[in-house]
């Protein structure tokens, strides 16, 4: 049986699932086994502690992807992308297709985060510059983002003074990784791995 439009509110250590939907209200379900498949979500500017003002125009790459592909809405025309993950590089190409100018892709690591294939097809083929060991030092703007200040980092990810550069833009897309949805796992008493953030499992993924 499938229950659509149903949200799980709680999972108890006794394997009881508390859920809610429009038709039945709050319901309680019980089973011998519960499969946790909540997935993950994108890191936001708060989770990477991005400094600077808080104007509009700062989005995750996945949000921008949904707007362009499904809702037909362009996030902006002059774009900087933080992070060289696959979604970020794919969105660099997609924004270019839609007429935007992608000024730069910044990556804090000294290496590419995504697939080499996407780097070639999404950045190199469209002459979109990639700067490794660079990050956003500051967001500039009031109501809407007007620019970002980029900065080079050393091997310990510490900013290097004197390497700052102002890059005008009206949109900043974040492609800085994913974090697991752990709220229900915690409520169910599942032990979490501090290294990866996900649940500790055995060889059978239990």
Predicted feature residues:
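Residues forming the flavin
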Residues: 1-206
């Amino acid at each position: 049986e499938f229950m659509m439009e149903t949200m799980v509110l709680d999972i108890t250590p006794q394997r009881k699932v508390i859920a809610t939907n429009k038709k039945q209200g709050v319901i309680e379900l019980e089973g011998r086994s519960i499969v946790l498949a909540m997935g993950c979500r994108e890191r936001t500017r708060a989770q990477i502690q991005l400094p600077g003002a808080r104007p509009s125009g700062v989005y995750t790459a996945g949000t921008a992807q949904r707007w362009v592909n499904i809702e037909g809405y362009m996030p902006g025309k002059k774009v900087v992308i933080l992070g060289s993950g696959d979604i970020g590089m794919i969105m660099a190409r997609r924004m270019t297709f839609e007429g935007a100018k992608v000024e730069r892709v910044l990556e804090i690591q000294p290496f590419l985060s995504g697939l080499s294939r996407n780097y070639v097809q999404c950045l190199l083929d469209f002459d979109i510059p990639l700067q490794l060991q660079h990050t956003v030092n500051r967001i500039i703007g009031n109501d809407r983002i007007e620019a970002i200040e980029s900065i080079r980092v050393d091997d310990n990810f510490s900013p290097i003074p004197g390497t700052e550069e102002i890059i005008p833009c009206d949109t900043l897309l974040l492609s800085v990784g994913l974090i697991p949805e752990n709220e229900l796992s915690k409520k169910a008493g599942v032990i979490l791995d501090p290294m990866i953030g996900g649940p500790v499992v055995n060889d059978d993924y239990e």
